[in-house]
């Protein structure tokens, strides 16, 4: 049986020999430095036409060894399927691409073991910088990575007492403001449904709720559910919570998926929004806008946060700025029908 010979992959040396020009000239042209090196348009066009005809593709790993750069940024989030993280990834990718970088992204599903594996994968790929939504327990690995000089920006959450760069939401104040809004609308028995987690953003949201209800001398009603719990089980837990706490007249959900499952639970109990119970949910999503009645949400400034993330990282990659950036951005309460003024009974 005849096996065709594998087509030889051309190198810069081959191109230089074929065109009878120096290897350095070919290298400068391929790296977009024709003008900088005053290489004639004729020679540049000659090289570009040739590589197009032969289908030349540069060895990116070899280039990274020469330049010390891959022009790839590693983006690690909790779940790329989550609308919040997918929107963030979209904006980061757009801004990175405009600046000559590509994004390699992945999901941790909040697993420490998976996070460690993915972090090693990024290192093996020689990414230039990291944007990370860290799982619990990843602090030591992040600190080691930062000590190598690699630019690392944390997103959505950070580590207490850490010295990392980060861009996060003001979770405490955002939740505090949500409680304030409900109180102003006449609601007094306000519950908080959240994830059983030590992550900084979840803790800050819980603390914001607790501080606000304490300020108004109201009762605490907190329901925590597991992060990896199936949707139907989350719904069942919220149904049980509402059934046991019939005095509740308002609920705040600390994540988008808790908000969606909370609406299912409320529907199962045939409760009316907002007549029987008012609702506020993190984060802004078309589902909440289209729901009848429409749902009040706590919106994170996704585009502004994404721009901050990529700008800080690009500055660090260009060695323009070595100071630490700790950016906390305000949330916005999008008031809709689900928190209409409570009718006096």
What are these regions (language model features)?
Residues 1-69:
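N-terminal helix-turn-helix DNA-binding module of bacterial transcription factors
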Residues 2, 41, 45, 54-129, ...:
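Amphipathic helical "hinge" segments at domain boundaries
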Residues 23-28, 65-79, 181, 189-196:
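Short beta-strand segments enriched in small/hydrophobic residues
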Residues 113-126, 233-247:
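Short, well-structured alpha-helical segments in soluble
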Residues 220, 235-345:
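Flexible loop/turn connectors
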């Amino acid at each position: 049986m005849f096996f065709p010979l594998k087509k030889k992959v051309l190198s810069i040396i081959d191109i230089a020999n074929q065109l009878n020009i120096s290897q350095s000239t070919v290298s400068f042209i391929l790296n977009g430095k024709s003008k900088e090196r005053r290489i004639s348009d004729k020679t540049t066009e000659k090289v570009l036409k040739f590589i197009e005809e032969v289908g030349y593709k540069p060895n990116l790993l070899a280039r990274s060894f020469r330049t010390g750069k891959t022009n790839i940024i590693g983006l690690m989030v909790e779940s790329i399927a989550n609308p919040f993280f997918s929107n963030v990834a979209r904006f980061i990718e757009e801004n990175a691409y405009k600046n000559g970088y590509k994004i390699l992204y992945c999901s941790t599903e909040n697993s420490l073991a998976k996070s460690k594996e993915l972090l090693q994968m990024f290192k093996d790929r020689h990414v230039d910088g990291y944007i990370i939504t860290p799982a619990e327990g990843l602090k030591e690995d992040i600190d080691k990575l930062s000590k190598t000089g690699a630019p690392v920006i944390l997103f959505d959450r950070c580590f207490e007492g850490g010295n990392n760069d980060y861009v996060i939401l003001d979770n405490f104040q955002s939740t505090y403001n949500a409680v304030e809004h409900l109180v102003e609308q006449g609601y007094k028995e306000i519950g908080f449904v959240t994830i059983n987690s030590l992550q900084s953003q979840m803790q800050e949201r819980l603390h914001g709720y607790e501080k606000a209800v304490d300020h108004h001398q109201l009762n605490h009603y907190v329901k925590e559910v597991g992060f990896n719990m199936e949707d139907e089980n989350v719904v069942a837990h919220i149904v049980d919570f509402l059934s046991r706490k019939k005095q509740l007249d308002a609920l705040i959900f600390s994540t988008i998926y808790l908000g969606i499952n909370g609406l299912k639970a409320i529907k199962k109990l045939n409760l009316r929004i907002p007549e029987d119970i008012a609702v506020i949910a993190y984060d802004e999503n078309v589902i909440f806008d289209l729901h009848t009645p429409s749902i009040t949400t706590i919106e994170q400034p996704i585009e502004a946060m994404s721009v901050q993330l990529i700008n800080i990282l690009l500055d660090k990659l260009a060695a323009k700025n070595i100071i630490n950036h700790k950016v906390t951005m305000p949330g916005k309460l999008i008031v809709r029908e689900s928190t209409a003024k409570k009718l006096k009974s």
